[in-house]
Amino acid sequence: PCCHALIEAGIAKVVCAITDPNPQVAGNGFAKLRAAGVHVEMDDAAGQACRELNIGFFSRMVRGTPWVRMKAATSLDGVTALHNGQSQWITGPAARADGHAWRARACAILTGIGTVLQDNPRLNVREVQTPRQPRIVVVDSKLDMPLDAHVLKAPGACTIYTSSTNAPKTQALQALGATVVVMPNAAGKVDLAA
C-alpha cells in the first residue's frame, strides 16, 4: 500500500479527498499513517470531484457493479428511427463529438445484437483523441452476429455474451478475434447478473 511509502519517505502531512472504498483497504492506510505520526487531513470539498474522476472504481467497490452510462439519441417526439425502421443521424456534430468524448472515457461500450443487425455500428472512438479504444461488448442470446459486422473489425477488442452453444459460429467469431462467453440463465437468455 502507498501508506508504507509515505511513511518511509518521511512525509509529515497527507491531505486526502476521500477514503478508499476498497474493502481490502477500508481506510486502514489512514490509521497506519496516524500511528506513524503523519498528520492526515480530509479535504471534503474535493471529495465529489474525486468520486467523479474515479466513478467506475467507486461503483465496483461500493455496489459491486460497473458504472453504466447510457447514451441515446431521440427526436423531439421521442423517436429513434424513421417509421420504416431506417436509422438516420438525429444529433448534430457537437452532440456526436460529446458522445465520442464520453465513449473515450469508457472501458467498454455495450450494445445488443438488435442494434448490430439494424445499424451495423462501429462503436469505436473517432471524433476525439484517445490512447486506447474501449472494449466492445455485445449481448447476443442466439449468436446472430454477422461475420462481417463492423464491431468485429473495430480496433478495440469485441466480447460477445451469449446463451448459444453453437460451436461452429463460436469458432468463426473467435477466428475473427472476438471473445465469446456463454452465460445462459434459466430462461435461456444471457445471464446479465452473472
Label each PLM-derived region with a short phrase.
Residues 2, 56-59, 63-194:
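Active-site ligand-binding patch in enzyme domains
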Residues 1-50, 135, 159, 163-166, ...:
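Zn2+-dependent cytidine deaminase-like catalytic core
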